[in-house]
Amino acid sequence: MPPRPRFDRRAPVRELPNINERINYPQLRVVDADGTQLGVIDREKALEVAQERELDLVLVSEKADPPVCRIMDYGKYKFEQEKKAKEAKKKSHQTEVKEVKMRYKIDQHDYDVRIGQAQRFLKAGDKVKCTVIFRGREIQHTALAETLLRRMAKDLEEPAEIQQPPKREGRNMIMFLTPRKTPLVKKDDKEEPATRAVRTITAPPRPTSARLASKPAGNG
């Protein structure tokens, strides 16, 4: 009986970057940290220049002849590259339409569950289709379904805004919510400080010495 194949459970070996002593090419075209072309120089000389500047020698184009290296702060460069990759991934997120279904007669617990689902979808950048399903004669209660959907929109007004208000679609009533692009400004936040100051009660002025002097003296 042939032996069973063994699976290598070890983590994959991470490819180390070609920097400093790990660069094995004898001749390099070197670009300084400020973009100045240092020309084609020996590997040892390039490493010496990088060490003098307390920076790293980084291989940026291995296929060139000779290979191109740049003198830079590799730690800072790596951080910026990872940041750019995260931003690009975030921008490439494909917006999906997630659906939250319910009946117009829904209890509080189930309603809270639907709110939580919608919040997660909106946080991920997806649109939410809120659907109230009618069965049989329930179709006559469209007004109650619309009230329920508008209540949901109100409870989700911070992370979302209405893209399409409640409307009848076959035997369902639907509403579309989309992630809010700008922060919600509440009425209290709109009030200017000067407007609030008008509401303060101003104390009456205290009598001055001039007013006291003009008061007629008593006959006593």
Swiss-Prot record:
Its main location: cytoplasm. GO terms for molecular function: ribosome binding; translation initiation factor activity. The keyword Protein biosynthesis applies. Residues 185-194 have a biased composition (Basic and acidic residues). The keyword Protein biosynthesis applies. It is found in: Cytoplasm. SUPFAM superfamilies: Translation initiation factor IF3, C-terminal domain (SSF55200), Translation initiation factor IF3, N-terminal domain (SSF54364). GO terms for cellular component: cytosol; membrane. GO terms for biological process: ribosome disassembly. Residues 182-220 are annotated as: Disordered. Keywords: Cytoplasm, Initiation factor, Protein biosynthesis. It comes from the Bacteria. Belongs to the IF-3 family. NCBIfam families: infC (TIGR00168). IF-3 binds to the 30S ribosomal subunit and shifts the equilibrium between 70S ribosomes and their 50S and 30S subunits in favor of the free subunits, thus enhancing the availability of 30S subunits on which protein synthesis initiation begins. Monomer. This is Translation initiation factor IF-3. The gene is infC.
